[in-house]
């Protein structure tokens, strides 16, 4: 067979050469030198690749699954079906697997990088297999079973008297449980991986069965095999069992290898390849045995065929029952190797022979159980519907019937620890519940994994579970939505750690509104720079999130967060701490949408109240700068007119203007105080004039004095103008219109959400600030007027404080009122010293 697909041996004739003996002895030392040089070069290359390899050892290659899964789900919005999405996700994972395999082949990262990539590959292959299982099972459950439901109701059951093939075809069409068993078997066979096991088969173009045994029988005196070694005397297939003698040792080894290769092909679902393998190695009787399981059908009995007067070939084995009984006996016998017994056990429903061989792998054991269960159900249906007398099967065969739940219970308590470990692993539990179609229990398991410790779950495990939940939700298999949301929320938290706004927004949008606000605001709290903030808001808008509520909660969380001071404590006066700077910059979140101007004012005012109470004037100024200068015009244009502004926004607007007036007054006072304390210094007088003083020095001194007098005049004018402006601005605070400074205007009713807004707490804060700031402003005003010589103005200040119109005296404590009256009394005393009465009027007799 020149086109044989199997590996060939370099042997000639009938005898196999010794393994690993192709190297001539005379070239051994030379070859060792070459090998040593090659190893040195390879180590050097590996070191270079270690240096150039990415530091995460393939992690970045695998992390592309996050955006790629997102892209696949986004494409779903363009009309892609749910099952097409699963196929696309599987294909994406395959692409990453191919890339990682390529990197391993190229030796990237050396041994350490290869080990880490291998662990990633192990996970990805299992994930791919699970996606394939999910697609196969639910495609049948959702689409095929729904389409066949009407047909099932019309039919009572399989038709009696049909051929074996017809009966089973009808059985598969009607029995969804059996069809699912077969789907799982097909999946297990498609996912079968031999792993590290190697089973080399030596072959050449013309193969003959048991050629070494034949050679020895034809050359009984051959010294190559020794004397007295008893082997079979005949070469028929039953000779070793009948004579109870072995084949030639090399043929025994080849026989075992062939049996193993055949079984592995059957385990992979490649029965036809197993037949070809038997024929290729000259063991046609094995091929005939493997044909015996096929269902019998004679198409010549069909009416539409008999009209053609042409005989068609008969399919299957008409004596299948006899073959099956013999296959059972072979599988149950101890005279054959375990692979031959297991091969017969696959087609005869003999579970014991399969468990003996496949005891160490969860998937292999599941495959063995399901093959047996399918065989029992198929055989039972055939014997119940076909009008034929069949050879009876042993009771052990029929007693092997189990449900899927019983199969998994047995796997959970398997003798082999590796089987038990996989059964209790996340992938094992996920695959088990997908097969059992117990989606509710699966989601409960996932929730327990997530709630136990999210940090122990890798982001890719969370990605995998979240997308399973999203698929189950889409096909209507999620019963408890809150449980499902916990899994998706855990994945969103993993994405928040990565900081990709589009992905975070998209998956957050699949949650309920409270969770959307909670999670996305948590993400926004971590974004500090302006451009990333804009991208985060844009992503939220595209995903359909409630941006107004999210940004409001974000700013509020940052504003109310209690953060300890650094090791240096509060910064110096006039400086802004990093904590305060973070709170102030958070107001940027409320600038993006014009509809949030009212919320911007509300949050800014709340910050200003806190900073004003803490005497952090510089923080107040910085907060004030975050509010657009034309905020009043924006609010009016937003609501159409001043009369349409809602109560909350109306109160916020007045409060904002109150702070604006306060800052203007305080800043003007600070400027006046600076000017007043920086009177131009008089130039230093020269020493007493002497005979040596010349005219030039005297002239220079006079010019300095004249310049000083001019500078003093300008200074006095500046101080006077600044004092006038300061008095006006400070009076603007005391005389603030519409019920006074930091007093809400009249509103017909409180806002609907006054309780959530802590409206009463705000009013208490404003009242407290009035009791702090109004006495302070009055003292500033008195100081400016007193130092400016306006003593009568100081006395008139008492009239404004005591006026019943504004009732400013109510914000004073006894101590503060006494302090103000004492300063006003000083002004009255100055008036008396100026020959005026205590109120500043001329004294009349």
Curated annotation (Swiss-Prot):
Expressed in spermatocytes (at protein level). Residues 1-26, 677-702 are annotated as: Disordered. GO terms for cellular component: chromosome; cytoplasm; nuclear envelope; nuclear matrix; nuclear membrane; nuclear periphery; nuclear pore; nuclear pore outer ring. Disruption phenotype: Embryonic lethal. RNAi-mediated knockdown in somatic gonadal cells results in female, but not male, infertility associated with extensive disintegration of the egg chambers and cell death in nurse cells. RNAi-mediated knockdown in spermatocytes causes abnormal localization of nuclear type-B lamin Lam, abnormal spindle envelope integrity and overall defective cytokinesis in meiosis. GO terms for biological process: double-strand break repair via homologous recombination; eggshell formation; female gonad development; male meiosis cytokinesis; meiosis I cytokinesis; mRNA export from nucleus; positive regulation of protein localization to nucleus; post-transcriptional tethering of RNA polymerase II gene DNA at nuclear periphery. Part of the nuclear pore complex (NPC). Plays a role in nuclear pore complex (NPC) assembly and maintenance. Required for nuclear import of Mad. Mediates the association between the nuclear pore complex and a subset of active chromatin regions adjacent to lamin-associated domains. Plays a role in double strand break repair by relocalizing the heterochromatic double strand breaks (DSBs) to the nuclear periphery as part of the homologous recombination (HR) repair process. Regulates cytokinesis during spermatocyte meiosis by maintaining type-B lamin Lam localization to the spindle envelope. The keyword Nucleus applies. The keyword DNA repair applies. Keywords: Chromosome, Cytoplasm, Cytoskeleton, DNA damage, DNA repair, Membrane, mRNA transport, Nuclear pore complex, Nucleus, Protein transport, Translocation, Transport. Belongs to the nucleoporin Nup84/Nup107 family. GO terms for molecular function: chromatin binding; structural constituent of nuclear pore. Its main location: nucleus. Residues 7-26, 685-694 have a biased composition (Polar residues). The lineage of its organism: Eukaryota, Metazoa, Ecdysozoa, Arthropoda, Hexapoda. This is Nuclear pore complex protein Nup107. It comes from the Eukaryota. PANTHER family: NUCLEAR PORE COMPLEX PROTEIN NUP107, NUP107-RELATED. It is found in: Nucleus, Nuclear pore complex; Nucleus envelope; Nucleus membrane; Cytoplasm, Cytoskeleton, Spindle.
